[in-house]
Amino acid sequence: MLQQKFPQAAKSFFTIDSFIKNSKQDFVLVTSNEEEALQLYKQALFFLPSENIYYFPSYDTIPYDHTSPNCNILSKRAETLSKLTTNKGNKLVITHATNLLNKLPPKDFFAKYYLKLFPKMKLSANELSKFLVENSFTRNASTVDVGEFAVRGEIVDLILPESKGYRINFSWDYVESIKQFDIDTQISTRSCNELIISPANEIVLNPETISNFKDNYLRNFGVNHTDNPLYEAITGGRKFSGYEQLLPLFYDSYSGLTDYLNNPVIIFDNLTKQAILEFEHSYNDFYKARLDANKLKFNSFYPTLSPSQLYFTSLEAIELLEQENNILISYENSEQASIVENIAAASFVEKKTIFDKLFEVIKANSRKKIIIGSSVLSSFERVKSIIENYEYSYNEIEYLEEAKTNTINIAILPLNQSFSTPEYLFIAASELLEEKVTPTNTNKKLKNILLELDHLAEGELIVHKDHGIGQFLKLEALEIKGKLHDFLKILYAGNDKLYIPVENIEVIKKYGSDVAQLDKLGSVSWQKNKAKLKNRIKEIALHLMQIAAKRKLNTTAAIEFDLEEYDKFCAKFPFTETEDQLNAINDIREDLSNGMLMDRLICGDVGFGKTEVAMRAAFMVAKSLNENSPQVAVVVPTTILCSQHFARFTERFKDSDLNIKQLSSVVSSKEAKIVRSELESGKINIIIGTHSLLHKVTKFCNLKLLIIDEEQHFGVGQKEFLKSLKSSTHVLAMSATPIPRTLQMSMTGLKELSIIATPPLNRLEVRTSVMPFDPVIIRDALLHEHFRGGKSFFVVPRINDIEDIEKQLKQIVPELSYKVAHGKMSPNKIDEIMSEFYAGKFDILISTTIIESGIDIQDANTMIIHKADMLGLSQLYQLRGRIGRGKMRGYAYLTLPSHKKMTPHSLRRLEIIQNSCALGSGFTIASHDMDLRGFGNLIGEEQSGQIREVGTELYQEMLEEQIAIFKDEPISGEQPFIPTINLGLSVFIPDNYVSDSVLKLGLYRRIGNLNDDLEVEKFKDEMIDRFGSLPTEFNNLLDIVKIKLLCFKLNIENLDSGDNGFVIKFYKNADMADKILKFVSTYTANAKIKPDNKLVFIKKLVGKTIITEANQLLWNLSEI
């Protein structure tokens, strides 16, 4: 065995440069942790660009898990194995040590199951669809995740690993084109000459593998479990959660990873063997735990295979490593491994910036090729900007071979540490810029999911602007004059039905609640109620306007502070500010300096740095040079949050001369009296308090800034006291999910809004799993958190569930301690328990949802949510936001009753929360959840009652319209009428074009929101790109939408056509007499006015010319 020594930071470079670059062999580079494997893979692609460099990821589940691994991982593993089988040339595989122990499908399997597509190839959409189903792809109405595909007539969309979407167009059973498309917009981006499709999973469900499964199941477990849901699903050709743990049952033989290569050289380090031994110990432990759990009849329909069936032994894996031609790497502690540390030290001694010294080092190494590597685009751009400021030349490169001398080469290249070689100097941007991790942005995908959900569900309550509250029954095609037309069928009281043409879908709004009394068609009560409400909304809008105006008129002295002292304070912030944080801070600086009272809402997700923004605002005001003893009050809803803020503020301001105190139930009566006295005298600069601060006995010397954290959690009386302070004080409110009233004020421009949507660089996404209640997984999760020095939350939806969970936890994790907290306990008792949990006096907090806000415990990073289907989307998101707030990754397990059948709505809600691990998606989710769950106690009782009368969407629209009127702005809200168009054409989206009714309703809703011809044309282009050429019926619909938009401009309420021409009815309040008379006199032969004031235009019409003639008629009318 060859042994080699070099700096650890240069592992990937030296491995490739020394062994792989000029070799004719296959290689496997083995790491001892997964993050290193992925980073080395990205580095390897930079150092040696090749199609034959592969990353083989590990499962993100534990051994014997009943939850399937992430679909991206499953698909990437299968794709890698397929390419190793089919691609020619020398290969490099980078993987984690545990993958040497996994038994995989036989090597020759993937040679049979892959498909190479290219234009003009003979293949039909149906044949491709069949191939995809048999290779573990999931068919959906639209594609969102890896491993999904959608069929729309002669177009097939699918998503392959690394979230690459492809669209295959067919024509007469031939592949016409292959295009890549953007998953977020669903629009094609570029054409491809070929596409290779591999299975989406190591297990494919086709007749051969299903037959193997039946035989091997019978051989291993003795009987066919026909009443077993897992067995029924698999034998029926359907995937089942966690079935990957049964992989050997699907094949007659197995292979190891190295069997897929040609006598490969394995490169590993001293930690590899330890990782293998630890994994073997782990899978044996989980096997025993699973057998014990099976005795308790938990999820007993999952059979358990022995370790020898699923894994190689550590002895076999280590023997593989110790073969003669393999390479053992060890690491040296050279000076080259700490280049930036040396630069930093020298810059400190010489009193220069780190970049001044860096450029001196670069000059000294001018004969080398200099590469600065950034792991994220944002730091790449920052590096570029710094180089430009120093007026150095730079060269943007994608691969090492593009690097040049006499310039600085910059690249997207993840490096943990800088290092040097005889030819190159590699500088890690992460060391220069304190770049911590590579944040992934999946917000676009989340928005896509939410857009899909924003459709009308059958049975949902709606509000018609003219007829009131009804129930949407279904989409129904009716025959009008021999032509089919899609209508929305709405049920009203007395079993009356209303049919709304799909092109007028905008006349209905979602009600936003599941319970309401249906209105009666034709009744005047709806219009009366709506008119009354309109007057009340006018009062609300006026009140909001008056509040805003009063603050604008109430001028105050601009806040001035010492900039040098402020900069020193900012420099002590231990992290790099995000762009959103800096924008929010700049907004506050402008507010405080413009001579008017600030009233700003900072809206940002949990842990996104709102508190640091608040502390900088507090510094600006408390250190004001032109105020006498200026004071800052920070008001929070809970004692524990008060203690946390007090500790943070005290630490952050420790080098200043500011006096900071707290006032809450943890402060004794005697101490509270002293604090209040010092507050009144001006000795205290910053006070942090709970409701104790909101008391009439509290007097301030000179309160200049009020910071309110989580305003929605304060009671009515406390809010009244806050209002009295607001009239003469700068106000900064902070929230992750603001109350709708505050949000309304922000959205309508009455309150200033700053949004912090960018996560800090060192925040990791919370990994979320949805699964049946499984004691083995729960035990592992709780112990894993315990052994990494952390604590766990166990959340139940009802107090009644607590006793049962206590019993189960005593059985599952007897070695861990717990305490219980719920809403029926006294506030002091809850605070006491929370303080003990914060201090680490027990391991698990069992609680109801009372912990969903105001808790920041950075070492509590695991959460089990029991019966997660009983909680709302926003609740689930808020709860999950309690974990993963520090540098440790958080793990959330949303458990479901094992045998309870979930409704599609519940499953979709849980799917959203599982998929939306993207940092910063809480604001979007909370807004959407209000739409799903309705209003209830989210809004004050007065507003809540008003919203019940018309529903959330219509209420918001009416309020925005009224404020626009007061502000003398254009109104984009309610229209006085909606034109009805009847041209005797077929108008609908055919099932053979868009078959999924949910997707079709979503498209109809989008059509209802098109506002001009350009938007209609863009929508039409998108439809052609996604679904193919527009059918005549769909094209008619979009043409009618254009005609409807023109009719609205011309005050035309109805446009009807017959064989002999058109009939036009004008809106009753429109003053059109002069225009109509002028039109009739111009077109005397064709135009006539009927006694009921309708305009008749006589012309023989033929089907295909109706649209053209209608457009011409309206154009002529508009020109008069």
UniProtKB/Swiss-Prot annotation:
Q: What does the UniProt keyword field contain?
A: ATP-binding, Cytoplasm, DNA damage, DNA repair, DNA-binding, Helicase, Hydrolase, Nucleotide-binding
- Entry's Pfam families? CarD_TRCF_RID (PF02559), DEAD (PF00270), Helicase_C (PF00271), TRCF (PF03461), UvrB_inter (PF17757)
User: Could you cite one Gene Ontology molecular function of this protein?
Assistant: damaged DNA binding
> Under which EC number(s) is this enzyme classified?
3.6.4.-
Q: Where in the cell is it found?
A: Cytoplasm
Which parts of the sequence belong to the Helicase ATP-binding domain?
Answer: 591-756
Q: Which CDD domains match?
A: DEXHc_TRCF (cd17991), SF2_C_TRCF (cd18810)
Domain (Helicase C-terminal) spans 777-931
Q: Which domain of life is it from?
A: Bacteria
In its keyword annotation, does this UniProt entry include Transferase?
A: no
Q: Which PANTHER family match?
A: ATP-DEPENDENT DNA HELICASE HOMOLOG RECG, CHLOROPLASTIC
List the protein's name: Transcription-repair-coupling factor
Q: Which organism is it from?
A: Rickettsia bellii (strain RML369-C)
| Underlying gene | mfd
